[in-house]
């Protein structure tokens, strides 16, 4: 695992750690044809545009002041492939309904875990897990 691959992810993570426009960093982090697998109801997305338009921007629209807090970060090689992984929470005030869940108008935390395979300085294969059931419980 090169330090370039690590710094690439850390730049992406840093951009998500503050409320604002995440678009430019997402488009530079993911390869144009990246295979991005997000939990249901998002499922398989192809490329940064789909990731932004179908997952990240709607999430940001529903959670005012959304930012992401990374708690654990790991990077290394497995079977000749470079992988980066992190876990933590998306945090924001749940102000608009999202994926069928009614907005609570309260500060909400969504636990996440991500795994990204890196090639040529971009994520080409990703698995993104969100603890939506925990959010459902918080919403009643």
List the predicted regions and their residue ranges.
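C-terminal and inter-domain tail/linker signature
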Residues: 1-140
């Amino acid at each position: 695992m090169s330090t370039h691959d690590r710094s690439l992810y850390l730049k992406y993570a840093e951009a998500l750690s503050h409320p604002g426009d995440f678009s430019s960093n997402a488009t530079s982090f993911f390869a144009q044809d990246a295979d991005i697998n997000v939990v249901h109801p998002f499922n398989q997305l192809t490329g940064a545009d789909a990731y932004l338009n179908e997952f990240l921007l709607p999430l940001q629209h529903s959670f005012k002041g959304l930012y992401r807090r990374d708690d654990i970060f790991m990077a290394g090689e497995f079977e000749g492939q470079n992988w980066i992984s992190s876990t933590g929470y998306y945090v924001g005030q749940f102000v608009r309904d999202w994926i069928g869940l009614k907005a609570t108008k309260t500060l909400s935390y969504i636990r996440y875990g991500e795994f990204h395979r890196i090639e040529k300085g971009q994520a080409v294969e990703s698995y993104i897990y969100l603890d939506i059931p925990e959010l459902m419980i918080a919403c009643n």
